[in-house]
Regions:
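The feature marks proteins involved in alpha-glucan
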Residues: 1-25, 50-53, 60-145, 150-157, ...
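Conserved, mostly hydrophobic/aromatic
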Residues: 30, 144, 183, 223, ...
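Short proline/glycine-enriched turn/loop motifs at strand-loop junctions of beta-rich domains
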Residues: 31-37
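Core domains of carbohydrate- and sulfate-ester-processing enzymes
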Residues: 80, 84-129, 191-226, 250, ...
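Conserved alpha/beta catalytic core and glycan-binding cleft of carbohydrate-active enzymes
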Residues: 107-113, 281, 294, 298-357
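Hydrophobic faces of well-ordered beta-strands that scaffold small-molecule active sites
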Residues: 140-142, 181-183, 254-256, 285, ...
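Aromatic- and acidic-residue-enriched carbohydrate-binding clefts of CAZyme catalytic domains
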Residues: 155-162, 193-249, 253, 260-282
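Catalytic domains of carbohydrate-active enzymes, especially glycoside hydrolases
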Residues: 168-186
Length: 357
């Protein structure tokens, strides 16, 4: 209780989910199902056990949102999680996820191992960064997986499979004539489940799912945090910003794939895209999944000059501009890519399909 009294709290503002800086402190906001109990768990930086747990009260509730403010909060000294009905809950709107530095590592049995970090209050020198503004009719797009693309590349001098390693590929892309790259999910996602039972290791079972790794990332994710295991440094924000800056200096745009399942909150989806555009200077998004609020994204003023690629949308919703370079909405049709892959592999009955494309 002595530790509890060290943390002064106030009622927060239930507008923006996650942990966000105020003029004189930090605001913590969490959506909680009706009837559930929740609390904020704070850890001293790199400490194994929680420093303090602060319950949300009815005073902190607005609808299904809990909001709690901590004045004079020094975020550089802390990490955090939430607790919902007695279980540790990692903030889905966290800007940094800690404890997932090694790709494919099984989830730790300690629920406090994975936790959330805060945005750094450091100024990044963008050096007058500008969006390349590559129109669709001039786009030569190169799609890649951040880890898989450079992991086996012997020419990479730095840490392979990282954002930093992609910087070394820029001269190669320029030589190919590439002016846009598309990153498969590069935000944080939990690629591994719980650790598999060592007593059954090596046994074949069609029903076995433990220990498998989701390499691609087309699952629900932490949409505001660059994937930590794709980083060569311990500063994901700076590393990703540096990649974008160097791409732009070379005249190459960056499109991010974002996957949203059916149950996704459309407001969080919109805010995630706005955040990557404003904070990381991303040029556009290939938005996938059954939970895509297409109309909401297309009519957002912040995203009005941002490339948005959907697999399907109502064309009547699109505001067509006279300047072709200003057309930002596109239908992403992978048919050509799939047919040509099969044709180049000499799959059967692909000559007609390739000719049609």
């Amino acid at each position: 209780m002595a530790e509890r009294r060290k943390i002064k709290t106030e009622k927060g503002l239930a507008l923006v989910p996650g942990a966000n800086k105020l003029s004189d402190g930090y605001n913590f906001v969490l959506e909680v199902p009706e009837g559930s109990n929740a609390s904020l768990v704070l850890y001293k930086k790199r400490a194994r056990k929680p420093f303090v747990e602060i319950p949300f009260t009815e005073e902190n509730r607005t609808g299904n949102m809990y909001a709690l403010a901590i004045p004079d909060f020094k975020s550089e000294d802390y990490e955090y999680n939430f607790m919902v009905d007695g279980k540790v809950y990692t903030d889905p709107c966290a800007y940094r996820i800690l404890g997932r530095e090694r790709f494919g590592a099984a989830a730790d049995s300690d629920p406090h191992k994975v936790r959330c970090g805060f945005l750094k209050n450091e100024v990044f020198d963008w050096e007058n960064d500008r969006n390349p503004q590559v129109p669709y009719y001039e786009m030569v797009l190169y799609k890649l997986h951040v880890r898989g693309y450079t992991k086996a590349n012997r020419s990479i001098r730095g840490v392979k499979g990282t954002f930093q390693a992609l910087e070394e590929m820029i001269p190669y892309w320029k030589e190919l004539g590439i002016n846009t790259i598309e990153l498969m999910p590069a935000y944080e996602f939990m690629e591994s489940g719980i650790a598999s039972d060592p007593t059954t290791a090596g046994m074949v079972s069609e029903k076995r799912t433990e220990g498998r790794v989701n390499f691609w990332g087309y699952i629900p994710g932490y949409y505001f945090a660059p994937k930590r295991s794709y980083c060569a440094t311990d500063d994901p924000e700076k590393e990703f910003k540096t990649l974008i800056k160097k791409l732009h200096q070379a005249g190459i745009a960056c499109i991010m794939e974002m996957y949203f399942p059916k149950e996704s909150n459309p407001v969080v989806t919109l805010r995630a895209l706005q955040f990557w555009k404003l904070y990381y200077h991303v040029d556009g998004f290939h938005v996938l999944g059954e939970g895509v609020p297409t109309e909401l994204l297309m009519h957002d003023a912040i995203l009005s000059d941002t490339k948005l690629m959907f697999h399907d949308f109502n064309e009547d919703q699109v505001i067509r501009k006279k300047n072709p370079a200003g057309k930002c909405i596109a239908q992403y049709n992978p048919g050509f890519l799939q047919d040509m892959r099969c044709f180049l592999k000499s799959d059967e009955d692909m000559v007609g399909a390739a000719a049609y494309r």
